[in-house]
A protein has these predicted regions:
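Short, small-residue-biased leader/transition segments that mark boundaries at the very start
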Residues: 3-6
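Conserved phosphate- and dinucleotide-binding cores of soluble alpha/beta proteins
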Residues: 8, 13-30, 131-132, 147, ...
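Electropositive, gly/pro-rich neighborhoods at or near active sites that engage anionic ligands
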Residues: 16-131, 272-276
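Non-transmembrane, aqueous-exposed alpha-helical and coiled segments at domain scale
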Residues: 108, 183, 197-199, 258, ...
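Internal active-site segments that recognize and position negatively charged phosphoryl groups
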Residues: 113, 117-178
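Structural motif
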Residues: 161-163, 192-194, 229
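C-terminal functional extensions of proteins
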Residues: 206-281
């Protein structure tokens, strides 16, 4: 059986967003960042429904609600009712009939920060996304505890996927939590990096595949990546000697309607193929 259909999938999601509707809610009400969690739930809905359309509804007009996403407000309301973020997500999962599990990297409010070459620091994903130079390092403010369920998911995983997503603001933040870095470092699972289909906007665009893999390994404290899935058109640009002995699988992965978005079926097939090759070695 294919790995992607045989096993239960669990997503560990970054909670450092401070832009858009999420940023406004955090600035005015505090709490964790719900935007990426909401978006992940929406992306894995198999059967669209009135409930899923309601969850993704975004207010328009000129009032205070303009630009706010109803799903963000629903999750924030559950948080204000003193419901654990993970339990709040599970309630929405049941409403949307989502089978996959979604876990925040932490259940405590946290922001992403960066140290710059000038010696100064900036705080916030929005500021980091707007950088034109690569930061010297990334760190969390304040340092928080990882969600226990996230640690357990890594410890029990048979395959761990990193990406796709914004490298500095989506993939890296969970790895900055010592408990998650340790769990990944000690894991016996096959670890696969999934590259983006398009070039990132901002400083992250300066990083090659080898650079990104090296930064992950540095943060985790060990060479943890076993394989990488990349767009077939980029395979000629990859310096294989720089990432050896990592197994590279280059495939057509883009959706027909949006060139920079992965097609679910094609990506699942690529994951199955690469896991099979890694298991055979």
């Amino acid at each position: 059986f294919p790995y992607t259909t045989l096993f239960r999938s669990t997503g560990i999601v970054t909670t450092t967003d401070n832009g858009g509707s999420t940023g406004r809610i955090r600035q005015e009400q505090g709490g964790i960042a719900w935007g990426d969690l909401r978006n992940c739930l929406n992306q894995i809905i198999i059967e669209p429904s009135t409930a899923s359309a309601l969850f993704e509804y975004r207010f328009t007009g000129e009032g205070e609600l303009s630009g706010h996403n109803l799903g963000n407000l629903m999750l924030k309301a559950l948080e204000d009712m003193h419901i654990r973020p993970i339990e709040a997500i599970n309630l929405i999962r049941e409403l949307l009939k989502v089978k996959s599990h979604i876990i925040p990297m932490s259940e405590e409010p946290v922001h992403l920060a960066a140290s710059l070459g000038s010696g100064s620091s900036i705080v916030g994903e929005v500021s980091i996304d707007n950088l034109t130079e690569l930061p010297q390092s990334l760190f969390l403010v304040p340092m928080v505890k990882a969600a226990q369920e996230a640690i357990q998911a890594l410890e029990q995983a048979e395959v761990i996927l990193l990406g796709p997503g914004s490298f500095m603001t989506s993939i890296m933040p969970p790895l900055l939590l010592p408990e998650l870095a340790t769990a990944l470092r000690n894991s016996k699972a096959k670890v696969i990096f999934i590259d983006n289909l398009g070039v990132e906007i901002g400083a992250a665009s300066q990083l090659s595949l080898a650079d990104r893999i090296q930064k992950i390994n540095e943060i985790v404290g060990a060479p943890v990546i076993d394989g990488a899935i990349i767009p077939y058109r980029e395979q000629s640009a990859v310096d294989l000697s720089a990432i050896s002995p990592i197994k590279i699988l280059a495939k057509r992965l883009n959706a027909d309607d949006i060139s920079y978005r992965h097609d679910r079926t094609l990506l699942a097939q690529a994951i199955d193929e690469l896991v099979g090759e890694l298991d055979y070695e």
